[in-house]
Regions:
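Cleavable N-terminal export/targeting peptides
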Residues: 1-38, 277-280
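Intrinsically disordered, low-complexity linker/tail regions enriched in polar/charged residues
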Residues: 23-26, 31, 145, 181-183, ...
């Protein structure tokens, strides 16, 4: 009798132990889950795309196209992460570089009209709440100039604070505010045209084929004066980060040389996007 009772107890313990082990494995603390999310993000390549990279050409909207109002705009942008999320408050450090070119391909000799250089360094923190990645906050120091001298020189340095909110897996809202710390001699009024802050969103279709961006850049002053950028892209194939893109720009400050000139441009071409949401 005792022997049979011990056999039953042994069997019950054997059944219960795996279940107890499963409970211990599943019940992880909030901190452990947050750490695992950071570890997954830190495991991604150190070198990656930053802002959108594109090659688009087009002309003025609402006017007669000519060699003087038609052009090609090129942007390349990348980042190099310097650390993992091991700095205070789980932040990480990275370098970034963006270059923009305006190319007058419809004129004789095909001259480049302007080249804008935008290097910088940033300190970012992924924001994790309720066991989910919900956003990112970044403090950065940026330089932007066009590499020219004399009266054609345009440059400024600024401290920027940026934030991203991942509202849904396919929707991100973003905002960025900057404080200039050094102006170039010939562009001291650049805030009146290139703005003081921006806000926008990026939406991706459920089938990951379409991407829509809209950014509003507020120019200095109390009036409702914005520069507007809208981009619509269609993925070339399912496994590619290349898109066919339509881009619309309306306002001032599209590039540094002619930052005081109003532009309304529609362009079409190739877009190359980061794996996740783009930076702005």
């Amino acid at each position: 009798m005792i022997r049979h009772l011990l056999s039953v107890i042994t069997l019950l313990v054997g059944i219960a132990m795996p279940a107890m082990g499963q409970i211990v494995t599943i019940e992880r603390s909030t901190q452990e889950i947050a750490d695992s999310i950071r570890a997954e993000l830190d495991s991604r390549p150190y070198f990656s795309l930053y802002k959108d990279t594109y090659f688009v050409g087009g002309t003025v909207l609402g006017g007669k196209p000519s060699e003087y109002n038609s052009d090609v705009k090129i942007q390349i942008s990348f980042q190099q992460r310097l650390t993992k999320s091991v700095l205070p408050f789980h932040t990480y450090l990275y370098l970034f570089y963006t270059q923009k070119a305006i190319w007058h391909v419809f004129r004789n000799s095909l001259p480049f009209h302007d080249l804008n250089f935008n290097p910088g360094i940033g300190l970012s923190k992924h924001i994790i709440m309720k066991n989910k990645l919900v956003g990112k906050a970044t403090l950065m120091v940026e330089h932007e100039s066009n590499g020219k001298d004399g009266t054609k020189s345009r440059s400024w340095n600024k401290i920027s604070l940026a934030a991203e909110a991942y509202i849904a897996p396919q929707l991100m809202a973003h905002a960025k505010y900057w404080i200039p710390i050094v102006y170039g001699k010939y562009n001291k009024d650049i805030l009146d045209y290139s703005g003081i802050y921006q806000a926008g969103f990026q939406a991706i279709s459920n089938d990951n084929k379409w991407v829509l961006d809209m950014t509003l850049i507020k120019r200095r002053g109390w009036n409702l004066n914005f520069n507007t950028v809208v981009q619509l892209g269609y993925r070339i194939n399912h496994n590619s980060n290349q898109f066919i893109m339509l881009q619309y720009y309306n306002g001032y400050g599209e590039y540094m040389m002619d930052y005081k000139q109003y532009h309304s441009r529609i362009r079409f071409g190739l877009l190359i996007r980061p794996r996740f949401f783009s930076d702005f």
